[in-house]
Amino acid sequence: MGKSKGKSQKGKIILGIFAILFIVIFVLYKSTNKMKYKDIKLPDSELGINEEMITKEKDKNVTNILLLGVDDEENASDSMMVISMNKDKGNLKLTSIMRDSYIFFGDDKVNKINYAYHYGGPELSIKTVNENYDLDIRDYVKVDFDGLDNIIDGLGGIEMDITSEEVPLIKGLKKHGKQTLTGSQAVDYSRIRKVGTNDYGRTDRQRKVMQEILGKLSGMSVTQYPKLISSFSEYVETSISTTELLGMASKASGFKNSSMEELRIPIDGTHKDEYIDDIFYLKWEREENVKAIHNFIYGE
């Protein structure tokens, strides 16, 4: 990723896949009821949404959804992303939030943004992101890492170019270079933090894995989606109703702008590394990053 944002190399296929997946997930949800649905009944004030954001939401016609990749062993979100759908401009944008970003939860707690899930589940995750970045998120989609494992295995694995430094950190791998990774190996790869630029390298690997998944999906027949999704739908939890899913799918399928822009928060030059009680944190400057994410999502 560039300093703040860049076009996805496979952006041209994302919107079609996005729409198809939502439709198929809806059908599977109705027929198998494997996907978990969790309604969030909290008012906007308890989700950290202020009056100014409610007005902006209506003016800009943007819907933001929090995507959580959850590590069940740590009971924390290993990855946090905000997907933004602009229904007027007809585009999607993806914002990645660094998991080590410092957020104060208490003197005796782990003060990282990904631990919002640990202390209060998806509701606190939504509230924390809203309050710290002045956003208007009401819904989420959560995927367990076992789900990612199953998705990739269902696709027959993905091809990645592995460095010699990465090989020892991926179970069952014997050589470096281009090769097909299994689901568990791809998860190992996406979670490497000790090679390269720590968490920055890790988010780059996660993006490469996602691009490969999208590439494989684009080459599949629509008739193959139900079998694939039924194998991992039990690992998905969301607060989005089936009616809302259909509405989003309908909107996305009509989008003319076929690229997805990406942003990483905090942006370069607005953060520093710091250790507190021997725990690593990413201290970041709020004003600059709120401005950056608003410029990115709302076009201000």
Where are these regions (language model features)?
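Non-catalytic, solvent-exposed segments at the cell envelope interface
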Residues: G2-K5, G11-K12, G16-F18, F22-E300
